[in-house]
Amino acid sequence: MPIFSSLNSFLRRHKKKLIVTATLTFSAYFLVNQFIIKKLKNFQNSLRQELFVKEQIKRRFVQTQNDCYLTILALLPVLTQPIINHLPIELITQALKLKKTNSNPTPQEISDSLLTTDNLTMHQNTNDSSDLSHYMSLSKTELWKLLKIKTLTRTLTLMYSISGLLLLTRLQLNILARRSYLESAIILAGGKVNDTETSQDYFIEQSYLSLSWWLLNKGWLKISDLVEKVVTEKFNTINARTELSINKFDDLLCEMVNELSTNHNQEILNAVFPISYDNLIESLLNTNPELIKELDIEDSIMLKLINETTYLVSNEAFGDILINMVDSCKSTLIENLLLSLDPENAYTNQEKVIDISNIKQFKLANLLAQLSIQCGVLCDNNNLMNDTFSNELSGNIYMNNLNEIESLDEFSASIYSNFE
C-alpha cells in the first residue's frame, strides 16, 4: 500500500536520526527519573535522620532530668544533716521539757502537749551532754526565743539549700549531657574520639560535679547565717504565745523571703556555687587539688565548664528561678500546715481548696511544732509516692513539686539545647 511504502521509505531515510533521538530521549528520561528518585530518597533519609536526632535529644534530655532528681535524693542526707545538727531544735526542746518537769506549770505557761515527741520532729540528734547543759542554763523565756529563731531558720535554710542544690545540679548535669551528646554526634558522623581524652574528660567532669562540695559544706552555713539575721529581725517581738492565722504566718514568711531576695541575692548565689576565685580554690583544694593548674590553661575543659557555670549562676534568670523554687517550698509548707492544723479548710472532696480568709488562729508554738515536722518531710529522700491527699506527707512532696516547676524545665532545656 502507498502509505506503508512511504512510511517504510521515511524510516529508511531517517533511521540513524530516529535511533539517536530515541536513545537520547530514553537516556534523558532515565537520568531525570533517577535524579528525582535519588533526591526523594535523600530527602526521606534526611527527614528520618532529623526525626531520629530530635527523638534522641528528647530522650537524653528526659533521662538527664531524671538523673538530676535521683542525684538530689541521694545527696539530701549529705546536705540536710549538717543543717539539722547546726540548728539543734530537738536539744532545745529537750531542755524545755526537762525544765518543765522540774517546775510547776503556771496558767500562763505553754502546754506540755506542744513539746511532745510526735509534734516536734521526725529527726533525733544525739544528745550531747555539754550542749544540753548549756541550754539547761538558760531560762524558759530564753529557750522559747531560741527555739523560735532556730526552727524558722532551719526551715528557710533547708528550703534555700535544697532548692539551690537542685538548681545547680540541673545546670551541671545538663551542661555535661550536652557535651556527651555532641561527642556521640561526632562519632555517628564518622569522627573519632581519643580514648585517652575520653578517660581524662570523664575525670574532669566528675571533678566539675564535685564543686557542689561548696554548697554541701560551706554554702548552707552562709545561707543559714543570712536567714537567721532576717528571722531575728522579723520575729523578735513575736513570742511563742502569740496567736497567728496561717495567712498572717504566710505573710511573715513572704516578707522574709522578699528581704533575702532583695538585699542578699548575690550572697545567696555565692553560697550556691563558688563564684569567687578564692572560694573556687578552696573547693578544689578539698576535692581535686591536682586540677587547680587547669584554671591557668585557657582552653582547658575544666575552665570552660567553670566559666559557663559561673556565667549562668550569675545570670539574673538563675536567681529568679531560685526564688520561684523557694516560693514553691513555701506554698507547699502552707498547704501542709493547713492540712495538719485546720483540715476542714485544707481540702474538699480530696482536692486542695485553701480558704485562707476563714481560718483559725494558732499559737506560734503550735506552728513551730509543725515546722519541725515539715523539716523532716523536706529532708526525706525515700520519696514515697501516695495518691491520697491524707497520706501525702509520707513522701517528699516538696521535692516532687520543685521538680515539676515549669521555669526549671525551661532553664534546663535552654542549657541542654545551647550548642554554640
From Swiss-Prot:
GO MF annotations, alphabetized: protein-macromolecule adaptor activity
Location(s), subcellular: Peroxisome membrane
Superkingdom assignment: Eukaryota
Predominant place of localization: membrane
GO CC terms: peroxisomal membrane
Ranges facing Cytoplasmic side: 38-420
Topological domains annotated Peroxisomal: 1-16
Topology relative to the membrane: Single-pass membrane protein
Keywords, in A-Z order: Membrane, Peroxisome, Peroxisome biogenesis, Transmembrane, Transmembrane helix
Membrane-spanning ranges: 17-37
Gene Ontology BP terms: protein import into peroxisome membrane
Function: Involved in peroxisome biosynthesis.
Homology family: Belongs to the peroxin-3 family.
PANTHER family tied to this protein: PEROXISOMAL BIOGENESIS FACTOR 3
Record's protein name: Peroxisomal biogenesis factor 3
Lineage: Eukaryota, Fungi, Dikarya, Ascomycota, Saccharomycotina
